[in-house]
A protein has these predicted regions:
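Bacterial signal peptide processing site
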Residues: 20-23
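Short solvent-exposed coil/turn linkers within tandem alpha-helical repeat scaffolds
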Residues: 69-70, 102-108, 134-151, 283, ...
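Bacterial N-terminal signal peptides that target proteins for export
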Residues: 1-11
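Solvent-exposed, acidic/flexible segments
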Residues: 72-76, 88, 92, 106, ...
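Juxtacatalytic substrate-recognition/specificity segment
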Residues: 164-287, 297-306, 318, 323-326, ...
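Sec-exported extracytoplasmic/periplasmic mature domains
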Residues: 88, 118, 130-138, 196, ...
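Terminal, low-structured helical/coil segments at or just beyond the last alpha-helical repeat
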Residues: 146-169, 173-175, 557-581
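Beta/coil-rich, acidic/histidine-enriched accessory regions frequently appended to metallopeptidases
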Residues: 28-30, 36-101, 127-131, 343-346, ...
Length: 581
């Protein structure tokens, strides 16, 4: 997700919530300790620091009273406006030129601090902003002081969130990733490979590529998102927010700290779409347009065309269309992360994804390009979409509703998979590869008959390590009621047991059935991948293992199977090093 264009104090929040033809994951990333470089978080530009210490603080109000030397108020106002426009558009080179042209003083220090924050030199930003606030030269109230306080809190929050971070740079130099916890460096080669695919595909789709490395920050606690953005802890947990794009960087939560992981690679590409749209439109795209394109194109790294809505989202959209209970564009502002539930957020995504999907299907890439060009020129986004489609927005909206109602008619739905944050007491078990999904009443949906009784006994026996008897109980459950014989949850548990019992041929059809129902469950996908490998279906195994990897790469045994099916010697060596049975 990404901010709406406007002055900083009115900015919308930058927020968010598998292959085909993918390149081999590049090896040998360049590793740096973030504090070991003069341009890294943890370092302070000595020239700017000296300026703060000797000339006093730098920034913006249309008055010369807080500047070190007299300056024409109109000149200052023009400089401040140009700076705000540049920083909002992430044009840091232009913003730096403006700061250099500003006279010394506390107002300039504020703008220099904002620039340093966007450069991710957080200690430098803190020094500049804290100096400006403490100088006594800023007005006691007003936009400039609010701006200084806002970015000072963010600069301090970013340092607390990242701590003694480490940094890896992709072999092509196009991506840099900063990790708050070194354990999460495991994801780097997979992220670099996906981003190489995304850069090529999305560059063609959107007609733009960054001329600088794209910065990712990977956090080891979802709560830390509230330290580095205007989000609150409640926003994060209510809507399951795991990624944001703001201040010219992408910030994500590690899948390691989620109960069952999450689609972290799709999320990374989703956020990268925001990044590109922000650059292309100079940050003038509203939330609904940003989110629609990001959701539509988030799978382009692994698919030649955008993928259709998943059944749960399709069901949500069909129900909302029938009840005329859609999320309005106004409700989406300033961020989908501020909607009241994961269901409403998922519905909003489904709406805007399919709206932009209809435009792309019917007008092609040229339609998307015209829409973005018009928005970049300052045109209202709804009017721009209407022009790109070829009629009024009202007629487009009616057409889109009709199309989606027809597509959803008679199609199966499914339960929405909600993101769950890992509790501290679950961390050790998850890192050891334990499947926490067996906890609780797993088979309550089977009702109160014999099938459920046998299935529950199967769970208890599994937890006690009696795998053979557990499998027999699951078979009895399937035999007890024809309606549950094909139950995907039951199929999964039985398939996993047969795999552990050394019967992969019996496991494959059961795990495949379960995977059709829940393709994003990483433990299930990993089990299916192993079963397919053991029966000799290496191509099928690679597909299943890739599903697991893009949701939770921290399943220890997953890498053992990836090593066995790897065709590239470098990949094989890397995966073997990560293998933990």
């Amino acid at each position: 997700m990404t901010p709406r264009p406007s002055a900083w104090r009115c900015a919308a929040l930058a927020l968010a919530l598998a292959g085909c033809g993918s390149r081999a994951a590049p090896a040998g990333p360049n590793k740096h300790v973030a504090s070991a470089r003069s341009d890294a978080p943890g370092s302070i530009d000595p020239v700017l620091l000296a300026r703060v210490q000797t000339t006093g603080p730098i920034g913006h109000v249309a008055t010369a009273s807080i500047l070190a030397a007299p300056v024409d108020a109109d000149v200052w106002s023009d400089l401040a406006e140009r700076f705000d426009q540049a920083i909002n558009a992430w044009d840091l080179a232009d913003a730096a030129e403006v700061v250099a042209a500003m006279p010394a003083g506390s107002a300039r220090d504020v703008k220099a601090g904002v620039l340093a924050f966007h450069r991710a030199t957080y200690p430098e930003a803190e020094a500049l902003l804290a100096g400006a606030v403490a100088s006594g030269q800023l007005p006691p109230a007003g936009a400039l002081r609010e701006e200084a306080q806002h970015y000072l809190e963010l600069a301090r929050g970013a340092q607390r969130a990242l701590g003694p971070a480490t940094r890896l740079t992709s072999p092509d130099g196009q991506v840099e990733v900063v990790f708050s916890n070194a354990k999460d460096e495991l994801i780097a080669p997979y992220l670099f490979a996906a981003m190489a695919e995304a850069r090529q595909a999305l560059g063609a789709d959107l007609g733009i590529e960054p001329d600088h490395p794209v910065r990712f920050e990977i956090l080891d606690d979802a709560v830390k998102l509230a330290l580095v953005s205007p989000l609150t802890r409640e926003n994060v947990y209510t809507t399951g927010t795991v990624g944001i794009t703001k201040y010219r960087r992408i910030v994500m939560v590690s899948p390691r700290v989620m109960l069952y992981g999450y689609g972290w690679i799709d999320t990374a590409v989703h956020e990268y779409v925001h990044y590109l749209v922000t650059l292309k439109t100079r940050n003038r795209a509203p939330v609904w347009l940003q989110e629609g394109l990001a959701k539509l194109l988030e799978t382009r790294w692994r698919s030649p065309d955008p993928l259709p809505l998943e059944p749960p989202a399709r069901k949500l959209l069909a129900k909302a269309l029938a009840a005329d209970d859609l999320v309005t564009f106004a409700e989406m502002y300033p961020s989908l992360a501020m909607l009241p539930s994961q269901e409403r957020a998922a519905l909003a995504y489904a709406q805007v994804q399919t709206m932009l999907g209809v435009l792309r299907e019917e007008r092609g890439g040229a339609g998307i390009d015209e829409l973005l060009r018009r928005v970049a020129a300052g045109e209202d986004a709804e009017a721009a979409l209407a022009t790109a489609w070829g009629d009024t927005f009202e007629r487009f909206d009616a057409h889109w509703r009709d199309v989606m109602k027809k597509r959803a008619a008679g199609k199966p739905g499914g339960a929405l998979r909600k993101l769950q944050f890992l509790a501290p007491e679950q961390q050790a078990a998850a890192e050891a590869g334990e499947d926490l999904s067996l906890l609780g009443d797993v088979f309550s949906h089977l009702g109160g008959g014999a099938a459920r009784q046998h299935a529950r006994l199967g769970v208890l026996l599994t937890l006690r390590g009696h795998l053979g008897p557990a499998a027999r109980q699951y078979e009895k459950a399937r035999a007890a009621d024809a309606r549950v014989r094909d139950d995907p949850k039951l199929a999964r548990r039985l398939g996993e047991l047969y795999l552990q019992l050394g019967k992969p041929a019996r496991a494959v059809p059961l795990l495949r059935r379960a995977g059709e129902d829940d393709p994003e469950q990483p433990n299930l996908a990993a089990a299916e991948g192993r079963a397919l490998r053991l029966v000799g279906d290496l191509a099928g195994a690679r597909v299943a293992l890739a599903r697991a990897l893009r949701v939770n790469p921290f399943i220890p045994a997953l890498h053992c199977d990836l090593a066995q099916v790897a065709t590239d010697p470098t990949e094989q060596q890397r995966e073997q090093g990560l293998c933990r049975e």
